[in-house]
């Protein structure tokens, strides 16, 4: 199963449109997970043309009155249990807190956002992934990610999506 991972789109408050390379990056995915700060449902509608979308509420969604999204979700994909949350209620970028939250949620993969910085790390048996932001990066690169699960094999790929810089970086766990 291949899953598109996105967070912190902040449309239209930070950028008017989702970069077209996001659509290209998500070609062939079975599902898209949005880790919050959607701020405009047109983003979800556009992504749903590619694959079903599950999103969670981010701190900016509350500010923009988008309170009908859940704060977290748990799904099963292949033999993996995946949690998704924004991460704004945790210390920014604290991997130990995210790992603890994953244990609380009883998941072995946790997708989060909020930092706008792409990151993947394995702590013990828990894989933590932040896809970064395709619109407001704090790392200098506008990114999304894909997560491919084939039985016990998990591959994470970060994709740079700004203008002509469509590049992929793959990590295996």
Region roles according to the model:
Residues 54-96:
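Helix-adjacent hinge/juxtasegments
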